[in-house]
Amino acid sequence: MVVAIDGPAGSGKSTIARTCAESLGFLYVNSGQLYRAVTFTALQRLSDPSALDAVEAIAEDVSLQVAQDGIVVDGELRSEELHSSEVDRWVSQHSGIPRVREIVNAELRRVVGEHDLIVEGRDIATVVFP
């Protein structure tokens, strides 16, 4: 089962989603964490994070898995690292790449086959889980 939560920034989506997930025993996922994981990896691997074709290639290559405590990136659990100022600086640009969005959305859909989810984030109730 998947519960998708949409809404404007600052509306309490994350708080409600986390509380509901905990109460129901569901996995809580914020799709933004996956976009941040792609950006984090791009920053680790690229000398020029503005090279969008290279970011797309990294998104296709990196292994991303949703976990209860963060995102597993190439086998390593990442959480705090995904919120660095450098990730903050680039994540919006990287998340706008259509192929990156396809990859993130595919991972979210894959997770539904393994867990009950409460998920929030970009295009979640309109594109990913309409």
Question: Which stretches of residues belong to each language-model region?
Answer:
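Active-site signature of alpha/beta-hydrolase-fold catalytic machinery across serine-
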Residues: T19
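Alpha-helical residues within the helix-turn-helix
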Residues: E22
